[in-house]
């Protein structure tokens, strides 16, 4: 690895990892569950980097030995040829490990570990846009289930012909934001709607916002800025239906954000949910403002994450989902059943390559 600064950084990571390992064996840490969990989590976040660095060092030594054997004129020609072939394989392996190490050393998005609120809003296209928003809810729900994540519908406003005018999902699990953050933006569908008698293709849109969950410490909300009213919840069965005002209609006066929450069983639970959604929305606004203010720095080549950015078109006639940031097509039938892993992995890879290019240019 030619870059000396990367070697120094890797040695520093290795040193920190060994120090954290030592602390896990410290009786004072072991008897403090909170501290033990924090240390264990910090150590786990470095483990892949340290293991890859160890593999790189071992491979580098193996390569040096193979190259020496290939150069040794006293050895058997057949043995020299085998050594040369091994050296070529080890060189390829070493290049792969170096690329992986560079990716592992990239700055991490502090939100990547967080759960999310995923908001889907029907855009242009009337009833068909609401139906499309409902399709997106199913796509993300199925993808989340395939990842063993937990999904819950927090808030909804149904469309007249089905689907949703607006829906908010809570998705919890391992590194949810790190993947689904790439889904923020405008999703356009081109198809013949079920409501279209003449068979004409319509274009409709829905907007996806991906909001990391935040607690009340990260986002403070002045109670005076909240205007709240209650309403009776509709629903199936139960003595409380249409008798007790459990639904909460919450307005944040400074921003005009309005949240209507009916999914929980009690008014208190719905209020807590509404505040949780509000914090996530305010935090997302902060993130958007921060990104908009960074004009001289690189913007992600897989998109800005802005709600107005058109990121993908779903064409039913051609059975094709086109990601405009990647300039690639993907099979629509897979996407519609929640199989979007390849798209997300490609987004992540392109984002990492862009960051690596910036890193190389800055050195």
UniProtKB/Swiss-Prot annotation:
GO terms for cellular component: cytoplasm. It is found in: Cytoplasm. SUPFAM superfamilies: Release factor (SSF75620). The gene is prfA. Keywords: Cytoplasm, Methylation, Protein biosynthesis. This is Peptide chain release factor 1. Peptide chain release factor 1 directs the termination of translation in response to the peptide chain termination codons UAG and UAA. The keyword NAD does not apply. Methylated by PrmC. Methylation increases the termination efficiency of RF1. The lineage of its organism: Bacteria, Bacillati, Cyanobacteriota, Cyanophyceae, Acaryochloridales. Its main location: cytoplasm.
